[in-house]
Regions:
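Conserved acetyl-CoA pyrophosphate-binding loop and the N-cap/start of the following alpha-helix
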Residues: 81, 85-93
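Helix-loop element at the rim of GNAT/NAT acetyltransferase active sites that forms part
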Residues: 9, 21-34
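A conserved beta-turn-beta hairpin within the catalytic core of GNAT-like acetyltransferases
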Residues: 65-73, 82, 132-137
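Conserved catalytic-core motifs of GNAT/GCN5-like acyltransferases
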Residues: 107-109, 119, 124-139
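Conserved beta-hairpin
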Residues: 35, 42-59
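Conserved beta-strand in the GNAT
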Residues: 50, 56-64, 71-76
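Conserved GNAT acetyl-CoA-binding A-motif
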Residues: 98-110
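A short beta-loop-alpha structural element at the N-terminal edge
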Residues: 2-19
Length: 144
């Protein structure tokens, strides 16, 4: 099985440039999302994680800590590292990390076309399909 590790960083860390590059590659270049949509005010206050396989940065994500749950956002695995189980392993590590901090639920707004990936990670659809940045999304949650 593939192994990954996560590195928690903040917005002002020099390594945030990796996150910028990953978001541009995945969201702007692949999904044609406007660069203006890739970064927002939440970036200043949320938890950011780089995803590594060995010394290679393979992806990133951010977590917004809410009152009683966490919200997974902007999870992106670089194209050449997909289909290697990194995303699922990453979610398991995030659940473990935040469970130790007494959180027991994670929510996310999945791009509709990748919702089955999140289902395999234990997420359940909730609510109706909605549009964000011109792409269909669905709210999902997972208790842990």
């Amino acid at each position: 099985m593939s192994e990954i590790h996560l590195l928690k960083i903040n917005y002002n860390d020099k390594d945030f440039s990796f996150i910028q590059d990953i978001r541009k590659s995945v969201f702007k270049d692949e999904l044609q999302i406007s660069e203006a949509e890739l970064f927002d005010d939440f970036d200043n206050s949320c938890d950011h994680f780089l995803i590594f396989n060995g010394k290679n940065v393979v992806g990133s994500l951010r977590i917004i800590v809410m009152e009683d749950k966490i919200k997974l956002e902007r999870m992106a695995i670089l194209n050449e590292y997909r289909a290697k189980n990194y995303g699922k392993l990453c979610i398991l590590q995030i659940k473990e990390y935040y469970s130790a901090l007494d959180f027991s639920q994670m929510i996310l707004d999945s791009i509709y076309s990748v919702k089955d990936f999140y289902k395999k990670c234990g997420f359940i659809e909730e609510g109706d399909i909605f549009q964000r940045v011109g792409i269909d999304h669905i709210r999902m949650f997972s208790k842990f």
